[in-house]
Swiss-Prot record:
Cross-referenced CDD domains: Ribosomal_L10 (cd05797)
Pfam families linked to this entry: Ribosomal_L10
Entry keyword annotation includes RNA-binding: yes
Name used for this protein in its record: Large ribosomal subunit protein uL10
Subunit-level organization: Part of the ribosomal stalk of the 50S ribosomal subunit. The N-terminus interacts with L11 and the large rRNA to form the base of the stalk. The C-terminus forms an elongated spine to which L12 dimers bind in a sequential fashion forming a multimeric L10(L12)X complex.
Recorded GO MF terms: large ribosomal subunit rRNA binding
Domain of life (superkingdom): Bacteria
Species assigned in the record: Corynebacterium glutamicum (strain ATCC 13032 / DSM 20300 / JCM 1318 / BCRC 11384 / CCUG 27702 / LMG 3730 / NBRC 12168 / NCIMB 10025 / NRRL B-2784 / 534)
Role noted for this protein: Forms part of the ribosomal stalk, playing a central role in the interaction of the ribosome with GTP-bound translation factors.
Lineage: Bacteria, Bacillati, Actinomycetota, Actinomycetes, Mycobacteriales
Ribonucleoprotein is among the record's keywords: yes
Length: 171
């Protein structure tokens, strides 16, 4: 019969995989409890960061349809289940890894695809959703202003021509 603690942990992992689209696997070997607590605080409420047995993570991931993580599940592994903005979380993980050399991002899973550590770090270089939308709005505003100017140009040219003709008649 299976260990009840493992069964409970497996059920919790399955639920987490089911409710998130993005997962990042990390190696925490060499981190102190204080450093891990600091990381959890930095990640915020949209991320559940927990240590789990590799075997249980493999089973839960496979049952949730998450493929491609098996090779990453070696050694001590902690899993970040991301409910919010993946870019912001990737930035926090990358910064934490730069400050704590013992911390390593192994890879992850996002939108149906397994990710390498390099891809997770590349995501950290992207702008978050809010910044991207602001840039898009700014670009659209500039383009709309140019378009309005182009549409108004022929009308203003006709008006100037009419004024010039009127001035010529009056002279």
């Amino acid at each position: 019969m299976a260990n009840p603690r493992n069964e409970a942990a497996l059920a919790e992992l399955k639920a987490r995989f089911a409710e998130t689209d993005t997962v990042v696997l990390t190696e925490y070997r060499g981190l102190t409890v204080a450093q891990t607590t600091e990381l959890r605080k930095a990640l915020g409420f949209d991320v559940q960061y927990s240590v789990a047995k590799n075997t249980l993570v493999k089973i839960a991931a496979n049952e949730a349809g998450v493929e491609g993580l098996d090779d990453l599940l070696t050694g001590p592994t902690a899993v970040a289940f991301i409910k919010g903005e993946a870019v912001d979380t990737a930035k926090v993980l990358k910064k934490f890894g730069e400050e704590n050399k013992a911390f390593v991002v192994k890879g992850g899973y996002m939108d149906g695809n397994a990710l390498t550590a390099e891809q997770v770090n590349a995501i950290a270089e992207l702008d978050n959703r809010e910044t991207t939308l602001a840039k898009l709005a700014g670009a659209m505003k500039g383009s709309l202003a140019k378009a309005a100017g182009l549409f108004n140009a022929p009308a203003s040219q006709v008006a100037r021509l009419a004024v010039a003709l009127q001035d010529k008649k009056d002279a």
